[in-house]
């Protein structure tokens, strides 16, 4: 398995997404969505260049869209860093 880590903010984003799903759609759907997002993150770690660069948003960042969320990530010496997992927000401010 390829190496990746979640930033503190991305971990908080993931937890918030799960709680929102749990409260609004129930345990089964929250688990299904979280499992799918984890699979996407593992795919990103394995094939980080599969998804487009978003240099116009932030230098060195890439973007993968999973259903209604955007996964922003970058590469460093240790592998993939998942920076944020966002819905519709001001991306520029959220990535600073």
Where are these regions (language model features)?
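Enriched for short, Lys/Arg-rich terminal
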Residues: 69-96
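Short proline/glycine- and basic residue-enriched helix-capping loop/turn segments at helix->loop/beta transitions
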Residues: 44-46
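Arg/Lys-rich, positively charged N-terminal/basic patches that mediate binding to nucleic acids
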Residues: 1-32
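Basic/aromatic recognition patch in beta-strand/loop cores that engages polyanionic ligands
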Residues: 51-79
């Amino acid at each position: 398995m390829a190496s990746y880590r979640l930033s503190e903010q991305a971990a908080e984003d993931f937890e918030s997404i799960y709680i929102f799903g749990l409260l609004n759609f129930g345990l089964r759907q929250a688990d299904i969505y979280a499992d799918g997002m984890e699979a996407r993150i593992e795919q990103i770690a394995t094939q980080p260049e599969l998804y487009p660069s978003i240099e116009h948003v932030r230098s060195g960042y890439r973007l993968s869209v999973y259903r209604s969320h955007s996964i922003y990530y970058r590469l460093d010496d240790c592998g993939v860093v998942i920076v944020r997992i966002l819905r519709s927000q001001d991306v520029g401010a959220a990535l600073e």
